[in-house]
Amino acid sequence: MQDFLKGLPKAELHLHIEGSLEPELMFEIGRRNGVALPFANVEEVRAAYEFNNLQEFLDIYYQGAQVLLHEQDFYDMTFAYLQRCREQNVIHAEMFFDPQTHTDRGVDIGVVIRGLTRAMEDAEIQWGQSSKLILCFLRHLSEDAAIETLRQALPYKQHFVGVGLDSSEVGHPPEKFQRVFEQAQNAGLLTVAHAGEEGPPEYIWQALDLLKVKRIDHGVRCIEDAALMQRLIDEQIPLTVCPLSNIKLCVFDSMSEHNILRLLEKGLKVTVNSDDPAYFGGYMNENFIAMQEALPMSKEQAAQLARNSFEASFLTSEEKARLLARLDQYLQNH
């Protein structure tokens, strides 16, 4: 079963590119740029990756991002993640990036976007990797700051397909960002938002009704609201669920308690994702394997989760059909 899961063609739709920065690369880039980290070595960094909640993780995540200053830094980080996709049969990836984490440190948004997109282009040329970018606003900052970020980003609009909302959820409801999401939609961008991870089901309603999102990132707390569940089923609104992340941040106490397969069996369009894999102990295959070991998960369920990931993507219908054909071919042979 593990070999089946490793070989399974899949798409990842919930991945923060800054959260893929492995400690080794963090140190390498830090040395290159003369940025001192508050850790003596890689082992110390890994030891610090024990979190009790989302905020404890975010504090370390923003520290790690301090090393990223130049276009090449963003290139190296992105290319390393896309190489991991190649190894794990993630044949399409939609990556979040957090421009405010960098522009607030004086890094130009163009430097960020050029570094990311150059890596994406090289991965496509070298092995046919499919990928897209989604710009995320940090919800612990003001909506005015998000509006300014969108303004700075729009000259590069051809490089990203949508906008999202991430960072500290509780106390920062989606309604806080209604205007900037309207502006993004008017500019032709798709919308997604983190909701219902630590925040209540009400935040999922707001994301759907006020931000008009096409996907909910996380969304696992929808199970507390029957009417919301029904709507997510009826409208087939995808949930980009991150199992290992949820355990690492104590959203669930253990993988055996995770509700992803219950949501799947009820007819919700759930997908498996790694969120911040360098911090949460696993990329896509590690997430699938952890689920299979703890829940357990059948081949049919794994195949449906993979199918959902392509159907929920922001690819064109032709591109979806091409990647789904690769999945079907794999399933026929396995």
UniProtKB/Swiss-Prot annotation:
Its cofactor is Zn(2+). GO terms for molecular function: adenine deaminase activity; zinc ion binding. The active site is at 197 (proton donor). GO terms for cellular component: cytosol. Binds 1 zinc ion per subunit. CDD domains: ADA (cd01320). Belongs to the metallo-dependent hydrolases superfamily. Adenosine and AMP deaminases family. Adenine deaminase type 2 subfamily. This is Adenine deaminase.
